[in-house]
Amino acid sequence: MIQTKLKGTGVALITPFKEDESVDYDALMRLVDYLLQNNADFLCVLGTTAETPTLTEEEKKTIKKMVIDRVNGRIPILLGVGGNNTRAIVETLKNDDFTGVDAILSVVPYYNKPSQEGIYQHYKAISEATELPIVLYNVPGRTGVNMTAETTLRIARNFSNVIAIKEASGNITQMDDIIKNKPDNFNVISGDDGITFPLITLGAVGVISVIGNAFPREFSRMTRLALQGDFANALTIHHRFTELFDLLFVDGNPAGVKSMLNAMGMIENKLRLPLVPTRITTFEAIRKVLNELNIKC
């Protein structure tokens, strides 16, 4: 079952751009190869970190196909299919080609600020529109509304193809409530690199990671050790990343991880407006920490 495979370190893929801001498909394929070679457990394609709202429909189709073809079934593909127009998502799920997609990631509707009942009905409509496994995504810092533990559990209990939640509320009490009361066939996945270790100690099964773009091998090692109950060694790795966790998001995501990958010589440091690269002070701080870490990946 797919919920047994969406564990460990999933990587939220960035979209590399060239200097002219066109998609750098060659760099994207090199990144996918790098992640496959360095123990990423699954890939999240066309999520927040991919700057998906700034991509054209044609670019999204091309990225999806190229990544699926390159992965070729070696690890699961989680595809971002979300928005704040329920009807449009339902139409997408009914009409698009999802060959090679193992599950979809669907964010809580943003901007409209639905009630908890509205959130429930939104996911009910999505669940009924597809047989694909669904991973919920709660990130109130971006959406403007928090999906409560009660609503999450109600959805998890009522819709069998809803298999997990990517939880990025930052509310450990809420996450713990979900973990303690969830059905057996429903998992909690961290949506925040910095709390992955403590969340696994509570019963989460892994992370959809941003920093994993740069350090898949070492971050995967941390999650695997934690999942095996080797908390001492996992915590040692977690502490090595603490400063980078902060730098990743000080100027927004994916600006931080793109600066990181640029400093490593893997991509151009380009984003599409309204996002911009990190400040030079942040970039230099990232480069300094990278030099100090000297992590072999």
Describe these PLM feature segments.
Residues 138-139, 161-162, 272-273:
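Glycine-rich phosphate-binding "P-loop"
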Residues 5-16, 34, 38-40, 49, ...:
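C-terminal alpha-helical cap/extension of soluble enzyme domains
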Residues 13, 26, 52-55, 85-87, ...:
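Basic, gly/Ser/Thr/Pro-rich low-complexity segments located predominantly at protein N termini
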Residues 28, 60, 64, 89, ...:
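A general structural signal for well-ordered alpha-helical segments in protein cores
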Residues 55-58, 91, 116-119, 147-149, ...:
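Short secondary-structure transition/capping segments
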Residues 19, 25, 57, 149, ...:
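Alpha-helix N-capping/helix-start residues
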Residues 2-144, 154:
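Active-site beta->alpha loop and helix N-cap motifs at the rims of alpha/beta catalytic domains
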Residues 128-129, 142-249:
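Catalytic alpha/beta core domains of metabolic enzymes, predominantly
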